[in-house]
Amino acid sequence: DGGYLDDAIVKLTPDGEILYEKSVSQIFIDNGLEHLLFAYGSFFDPDPIHINDIQPVNFDGEYWKKGDVFLSLAGQSMVILFRPSTEEILWKRQKNIFYQHDINIINEEEISIFNNNKRLFYQKKDYIDGHNEVLIYNFKTQQVSSYLQKSLEREDVRTPGQGRGKILSNGDLFVEETDYAR
């Protein structure tokens, strides 16, 4: 009722001691993206961020460093790569992802994103445009591809909320279609 949900990221020790804490709204403000928090015209969204997934980076590479984090922000239909040590958003993607969830690091230059393809219409009615998909973003080529799209289409995978997609080491795709319990 008139409130504002401000998600945050927190790094804890195994004993629960807080090592780092930062409001995602403040991350946006510090990186010149404040306009995205209030870009709804006359409609007030009390949850403009809504973190769906945080994927920590556990190794150094050309495009990220150990300690960086990928954030899946459903309220923005955005994925960002954030570096807590400098408080800088290194990369962001909003194109052709809708209320996405799970992010996984595949290798030194690729991530996967579970794209729900959910459209949210007036009065918050959900609609899935086709089916869910697992997208692969390649940082080297800056290209996006859809992984096993025909299989997801054939199986009619279309969870509007939640969901996971993990590419296994043998190339198989493990999918959790949460809202339909499969």
Q: What does each model-found stretch correspond to?
A:
Residues D1-R182:
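Histidine-/acidic-rich catalytic cores in large beta-rich domains
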